[in-house]
Amino acid sequence: MRNILLVTKGHPYERQPFYQIFDDMPDVDYTLVEQPAAQALFSIEEGRAYDAYVLYDMPGIRFRPDRAPDFLEPPARYRQNFEALIEAGHGFVFLHHAIAGWPAWEGYAEILGGRFLYMPGSLRGLPRQDSGYRHRVTHNVQVVADHPVTADVPRSFSITDELYLFEVFEDDVQPLLRSDYVFTQDNFYSATKAVVEQKLFNNDGWRHDPGTNLMGWTRTIGKSRIVYL
């Protein structure tokens, strides 16, 4: 039996279908904890109870109805404990919108291997546009690497999901899954327009470089194996 800590909150999601994914795994026992309470379980001592942390959260952002969101620094103790877990070799799986978490902590993008930007900013010292999103996209996904994460996954499959036009450090990750969707600005909507101007599904005047079709990857940082899906 594998024990995982499942961390959520910060972005809406369909709760019961999501929990059912883990309920249907006969060899997995999970403990569900929401942010910020979950931060107390990020330590070497607490981590001994779990084989991996699975993060479906989006901490560090406070959305405002009339202006840009606030980006919050992670508590110093939590950040230190998180980095200690990475150095010690703990396993982490980050899911979907988790890549937008802790935007004020640049090192968080280095852990995940990329970032979704709600606002224009800088990444690795370079200016970057705000990221794009597109809901309910039906597309085909290809498995591009033999890896334990993709074991028993069909080499090609169709899925309907929200896609991102975001930043991925492709040179620093091992690709696992790629999409056949076209990741260009015309096919996505501006994240900044959504959260600042309250204009959903809008890309008027928005410009963004073509992006990666990478949907899932793994990387090693410190002694930890990191997976993003």
Regions flagged by a language model, labelled:
Residues 1-2, 220-227:
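Beta-strand-turn-beta hairpins that frame and shape the catalytic cleft
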Residues 162-165, 205, 211-220:
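Short, surface-exposed beta-strand/loop micro-motifs that present aromatic residues
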Residues 47-105, 223:
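Short alpha-beta junction capping motif
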Residues 11-12, 37-38, 59-62, 98-102, ...:
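Solvent-exposed loop/turn segments at secondary-structure junctions
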Residues 187-208:
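Short, surface-exposed loop/helix-turn segments at secondary-structure junctions
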Residues 7-8, 95, 229:
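Short hydrophobic segments within beta-strands
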Residues 2, 95-191:
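An acidic, glycine-rich "communication" segment
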Residues 1-52, 59:
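Aromatic-Pro/Gly-enriched surface loop or interdomain linker
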